[in-house]
Amino acid sequence: MRGEIMKEKCGIFGAYSQDATKKTYYGLMALQHRGQEGAGISVWDGDIRTVKGHGLVSEVFKGGSIRRLNGNPVIGHVRYSTSGSLSEVQPLEVECCGYKVSIAHNGTLTNFLPLRRFYESRGFKFRSSIDTEVIAVSFLNHYSELKDEFEAMSRVFEEVKGAYSVLMLFNGKLIAVRDPVGFRPLSFGAGDGYYFSSEDSALRMFCTNIRDVSPGEVIVVKDGEAESKIVGRSEHAYCVFEYIYFARPDSIINGISVYWARYRMGVELARESPAEGDVVIAVPDSGRTAALGFAHESGIPYMEGLIKNRYIGRTFIMPSGREIKVRLKLSPVKEVIKGRRIVLVDDSIVRGTTMKNIVKMLRDAGAREVHVRIASPPIRYPCYMGIDIPTRHELIAAWKSIEEIKKEIGADSLAYLSVEGLKRAIGTDKLCMACLTGNYPEWAFDFKV
C-alpha cells in the first residue's frame, strides 16, 4: 500500500528511431509510477549528452530543455530515491579503459561492494556511490579486452550478481540487457524503430510488435538493425511484487497480464479466507483489482468506499501525524460505509501503521465491522534485489502473528493470501518470493570476485 510504501528503484526506457528523444520523454511519463524523485535522458549525437535532475519527468524537462536534446539512440530513467547528489541521478555517464558509456539501470547488485573494491584495487576510480557504475565499469573493462558487446556482457553476467535490467548508449549503439534470473522486467518493441521499456504498457503508443527481453538476453541495436543473443543462463525468478503492486495493471510481464494476476489474487483470497460482509471496498489504487476479484468470487457487492485525493503532489509539505496523513490522502464515503460490515482489500501490509489508521477511519465513518483481506502473503524478510522494503524489525509480520496484527490494526478479522494461492493467481512458480519466504535465489549471491 502506498501509505507506508515499498518503493521500486526505477524505470528505464530507450529508443532507436526518429524523434527518439521525444518518444523517450513520453515513455518516461508512462513509467512515472516507478519513480517520482529523479529523471534523466541521455542522447547520442556523435557524443553522449545528458540532462537530468531531481523531480518528476515534467519538472526536470520543463522550459524547453527536451528540445535541446536531439540525437539517436536515446535512453531515459526515472528514479525514486531522494538521497544522493545529482551525479547519482541516472542515466550515468561512465568513462574507463578509453571508452565512454551512458547507462540506465533498474535493480540492485548483491555483490556491489566486493566488486567495487576489486576494481578499485586495480586502479579504477569511481565517481558515484551507486551500484550502476559498477555494471558500466565491468562492461567497459571486458569490452576493452574482447572488443565484442556480447562477449563482454557474458563476462559481466559471470561477475555481476543481483537484479539488473540495463540500457546503455555505447559508440552510437543502444544495448539492452536483462540479468540471467530475470528479476526486473524489460520489454522490447519494434515498429518504425526499436524500443525498450521496463513495462510494455509504455511501448504501445509506438509499436505493437512487443515481447519480453528474455533473462540473460543481450540486444544490440546499431545501424538500424537489432541483434540478439542469450549469453547468460540461470533458473528464472521474476520479482513477485511486480505482479502484486509495482507494475501498471495494463502491463504484461513475462507473458502474464498484471491485471488478471491481481484479479485472480482476489479470487483466490475469497476462496481461502471468505468474510461475512455487506460490501467489499479497496484501498485505492493498490487494492482495487484484487478487491474486484474478491467481490466477484464471494458474491458480495463491490463499492467505492474510499476516495483518493489525487492532487497532493510530491512536493506537498505533509504534516507529521500518521493519522492526518492518511486522512489527507483518503476520504471515506460515509453513505457506503455507515451501518455495514466492510470487507477491506489491499495488496499488502508493511509496517501496519497505515492500515491501522484506515480501519479507524472506517469505524469513525460508521462501519459495523471491518474485515481486512490482504491479496499477498505476509512480508517477513528484506529484499536485496532492488525493492526498498524496510529492515526486518520494521516489518510487522516479521515479529507479530496474524492474530497480533489483527489486534494492532483494530480489525474484526484479518487474513492473507497463501504462497500457494499467490502462485496459482500469477500462473507460474518461476518467482522470486524471498521477501515472503526468506528463500533467496542462489545465482544472486554466487559471488565470483
Swiss-Prot record:
Binds 1 Mg(2+) ion per subunit. Binds 1 [4Fe-4S] cluster per subunit. InterPro entries: GATase_2_dom, Ntn_hydrolases_N, PRibTrfase_dom, PRTase-like, PurF, PurF_N. The lineage of its organism: Archaea, Methanobacteriati, Methanobacteriota, Thermococci, Thermococcales. [4Fe-4S] cluster binds at C239, C383, C432, C435. The active site is at C10. Catalyzes the formation of phosphoribosylamine from phosphoribosylpyrophosphate (PRPP) and glutamine. Its cofactor is Mg(2+); [4Fe-4S] cluster. Pathway: Purine metabolism; IMP biosynthesis via de novo pathway; N(1)-(5-phospho-D-ribosyl)glycinamide from 5-phospho-alpha-D-ribose 1-diphosphate: step 1/2. One of its GO terms (molecular function) is magnesium ion binding. Pfam families: GATase_7, Pribosyltran. Mg(2+) binds at S286, D346, D347. It comes from the Archaea. Residues 10-224 form the Glutamine amidotransferase type-2 domain. PROSITE patterns: GATASE_TYPE_2, PUR_PYR_PR_TRANSFER. GO terms for biological process: 'de novo' IMP biosynthetic process; purine nucleobase biosynthetic process. PANTHER family: AMIDOPHOSPHORIBOSYLTRANSFERASE. In the C-terminal section; belongs to the purine/pyrimidine phosphoribosyltransferase family. It comes from Pyrococcus horikoshii (strain ATCC 700860 / DSM 12428 / JCM 9974 / NBRC 100139 / OT-3). Its EC number is 2.4.2.14. Keywords: 4Fe-4S, Glutamine amidotransferase, Glycosyltransferase, Iron, Iron-sulfur, Magnesium, Metal-binding, Purine biosynthesis, Transferase. Residues 1-9 form a propeptide. This is Amidophosphoribosyltransferase.
